[in-house]
């Protein structure tokens, strides 16, 4: 007898006896498998019927993808369901009892209140109704996920039913907002279980999710600072990421760890208003200076001290950091136009015109005299709104640098006359190591040498101003927005955002994953997951293409569905998921992204490790 004729008879028997409907393709495959297992011994029709039914009881209906429930049942507010429907129970919970009490009972922890109170709990009166059990079932026909509520007590059901149990619901069943109201006359137990669901829908795990308790799979979020922040997820279920302040702090800390150890950490003081800064005593200066920590800037001429031969000894990461520092200095060259000067005296902020002048390795020397701000070579008119003047504070006792070296044209020599007799002067200084200032004559007046460390200053009130640098406040990334989007080996996210492309643009960036913003899911036969990436200059929401996720997991969606039928092989898929999770967490590489400006998000098309070719491209870009 052919497999097709046997399948037709089995299909008729399943429908007539159990009201079970299955796809013909699955039925024929099941019959072939049963015959192979029995060495092609001719089985009677009754034996074949029984074995097929047993296999159906152990099958996950989601793999069959055979619709039974009417379409639109979830969208209909209320109605009645008529007929016979063989459904699968994924999980069930007794909603009449607190979930916390149930999970404590499962764990064998006795936390009843009468053990720690003076009085026992109030005994219910005889006439008071006892609380009745109410099970809430998560049901599926393989396509539609629907809930079933134990509207009246159903003896056939209990909370210890294994996930994947099959039941038959029949008769007239009312439903409200996607919930079937089940009664004893509507439910018949068929049995069965699904091994693949035993772990995912274990009773303890289901209750733990209800009370918001995390699943016991721990992962970490990289913050690029050698610190580990534990994050607890369910496979690839994302948790709340760190705050913006923590992310920015972590990026700053990473720069400090990866940069040269010879470069000291500076603290800067800004002339301007800030709600988060502390003013210096006004007796020291007529202008109010406020202290605010900021990320250390790498001196320009320090980065230029390295020759091409020395760059060969650098690691790739150090070379990338060096490139970023150079880009920051180029940004100051192109974008520096404004300077903010806020004074606490009654004088209003004056506007100054300037002549352009290139000052190499400049520093700000402050000396008590008349309150004149004298400078030569003035160019460009400066307002006091968007730029801030910053100088390292004398309060930083451990700072080993008294001048911030810049090899950029600086348009600021300015004069501000006030009531006191202090003179502020900017002069050009040549220093081989950037840590000392020589005695020089400037405008006929001797300017005293500034000690290397603030602890060497005999009178703090007379030497509060040290070397100062100019900080651009408009663009916190410090990167040139005019940078070519296709400059090899990569560009910066901030440059991409600032260029405001009108159409979909494909570029390369060197970035890492800050956090996953969505679950790993499969739809239409492809994997998908959403994440937020950063390169230290900006953040961007991205999706990953199926090819990347398939390579990380090791299995495609279709392969995963086949593996789910075999518990032994399915374990390999779970291991692949964990491997994918670890690699996404540690991911920091070159990403080819397709940026869609209308959606303000991108698609990651390819991943590539940094290699020596990229280092050579960086060298060439440095020489331009």
UniProtKB/Swiss-Prot annotation:
Keywords: Acetylation, DNA replication, Isopeptide bond, Nucleus, Phosphoprotein, Ubl conjugation. Belongs to the RMI1 family. It comes from the Eukaryota. This is RecQ-mediated genome instability protein 1. Its main location: nucleus. There is a cross-link at residues 334, 387, 425 (Glycyl lysine isopeptide (Lys-Gly) (interchain with G-Cter in SUMO2)). Residues 378-422 are annotated as: Disordered. The modification N-acetylmethionine is found at residue 1. GO terms for cellular component: nuclear body; RecQ family helicase-topoisomerase III complex. The keyword Acetylation applies. Pfam families: RMI1_C (PF16099), RMI1_N_C (PF08585), RMI1_N_N (PF21000). Transmembrane segments: none annotated. PANTHER family: RECQ-MEDIATED GENOME INSTABILITY PROTEIN 1, RECQ-MEDIATED GENOME INSTABILITY PROTEIN 1 RMI1. Coiled coil: none annotated. Essential component of the RMI complex, a complex that plays an important role in the processing of homologous recombination intermediates to limit DNA crossover formation in cells. Promotes TOP3A binding to double Holliday junctions (DHJ) and hence stimulates TOP3A-mediated dissolution. Required for BLM phosphorylation during mitosis. Within the BLM complex, required for BLM and TOP3A stability. InterPro entries: RMI1_C, RMI1_N, RMI1_N_C_sf, RMI1_N_N_sf, RMI1_OB. GO terms for molecular function: nucleotide binding. The keyword Ubl conjugation applies. Component of the RMI complex, containing at least TOP3A, RMI1 and RMI2. The RMI complex interacts with BLM. Directly interacts with RMI2 and TOP3A. May bind DHJ. Interacts (via N-terminal region) with BLM; the interaction is direct. The modification Phosphoserine is found at residues 225, 292. Residues 390-406 have a biased composition (Polar residues). It is found in: Nucleus. GO terms for biological process: DNA replication; double-strand break repair via homologous recombination; glucose homeostasis; multicellular organism growth; reduction of food intake in response to dietary excess; resolution of DNA recombination intermediates; resolution of meiotic recombination intermediates; response to glucose.
């Amino acid at each position: 007898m052919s497999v097709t004729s046997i399948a037709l008879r089995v299909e008729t028997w399943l429908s007539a006896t159990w009201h079970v409907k299955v796809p013909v393709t699955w039925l024929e495959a099941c019959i072939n498998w049963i015959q192979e297992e029995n060495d092609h011994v001719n089985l009677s029709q009754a034996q074949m019927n029984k074995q097929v039914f047993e296999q159906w009881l152990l099958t996950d209906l989601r793999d069959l993808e055979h619709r039974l429930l009417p379409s639109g049942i979830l969208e209909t507010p209320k109605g009645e369901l008529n007929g016979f429907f063989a459904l699968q129970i994924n999980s069930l919970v007794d909603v009449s009892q607190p979930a916390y009490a149930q999970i404590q009972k499962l764990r064998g922890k006795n936390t009843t209140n009468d053990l720690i109170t003076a009085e026992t709990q109030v005994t219910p009166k005889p006439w008071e109704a006892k609380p009745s059990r109410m099970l809430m079932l998560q049901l599926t026909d393989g396509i539609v996920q629907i809930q079933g509520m134990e509207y009246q007590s159903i003896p056939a059901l209990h909370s210890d039913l294994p996930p994947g149990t099959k039941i038959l619901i029949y008769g007239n069943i009312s439903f409200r907002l996607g919930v079937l109201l089940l009664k004893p006359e509507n439910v018949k137990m068929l049995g069965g279980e699904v091994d693949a669901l035993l772990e995912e829908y274990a009773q303890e795990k289901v209750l733990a999710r209800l009370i918001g308790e995390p699943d016991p799979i721990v992962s970490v979020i990289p913050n690029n600072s050698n610190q580990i922040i534990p994050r607890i997820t369910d496979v690839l279920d994302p948790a709340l990421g760190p705050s913006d302040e923590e992310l920015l702090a972590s990026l700053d800390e990473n720069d400090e760890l990866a940069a040269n150890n010879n470069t000291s950490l500076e603290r800067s003081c800004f002339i301007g208003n800030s709600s988060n800064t502390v003013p210096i005593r006004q007796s020291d200066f007529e202008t109010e200076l406020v202290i605010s920590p900021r990320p250390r800037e790498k001196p320009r001429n320090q980065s230029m001290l390295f020759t091409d031969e020395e760059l060969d000894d650098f690691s790739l990461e150090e070379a990338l950091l060096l490139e970023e520092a150079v880009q920051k200095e180029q940004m100051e060259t192109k974008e520096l136009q404004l300077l903010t000067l806020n004074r606490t005296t009654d004088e209003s902020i004056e506007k100054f015109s300037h002549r352009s002048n290139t000052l190499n390795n400049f520093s700000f020397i402050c000396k008590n005299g008349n309150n004149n701000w004298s400078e030569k070579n003035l160019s460009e008119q400066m307002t006091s709104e968007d730029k801030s003047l910053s100088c390292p504070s004398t309060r930083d006792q451990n700072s080993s640098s008294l001048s911030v070296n810049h090899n950029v044209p600086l348009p600021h020599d300015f004069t501000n006359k006030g009531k006191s007799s202090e003179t502020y002067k900017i002069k050009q200084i040549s220093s081989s190591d950037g840590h000392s200032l020589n005695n020089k004559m400037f405008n006929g007046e001797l300017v005293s040498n500034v000690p290397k460390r603030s602890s060497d200053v005999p009178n703090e009130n007379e030497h509060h101003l040290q070397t100062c640098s100019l900080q651009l406040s408009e663009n916190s990334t410090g990167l040139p927005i005019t940078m070519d989007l296709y400059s090899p080996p990569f560009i910066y996210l901030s440059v991409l955002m600032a260029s405001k492309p009108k159409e979909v643009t494909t570029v390369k960036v060197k970035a890492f994953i800050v956090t996953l913003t969505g679950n790993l899911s499969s739809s239409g036969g492809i994997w998908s997951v959403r994440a937020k990436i950063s390169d230290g200059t900006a953040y961007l929401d991205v999706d990953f293409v199926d090819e990347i996720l398939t390579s990380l997991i090791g299995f495609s969606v279709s392969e995963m569905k086949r593996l789910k039928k075999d518990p032994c092989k399915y374990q390999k898929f779970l291991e692949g998921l964990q491997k994918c999770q670890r690699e996404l967490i540690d991911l920091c590489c070159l990403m080819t992204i397709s940026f869609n400006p209308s959606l303000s998000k991108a698609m990651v098309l390819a991943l590539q490790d940094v290699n020596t070719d990229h280092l050579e491209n960086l060298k060439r870009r440095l020489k331009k």
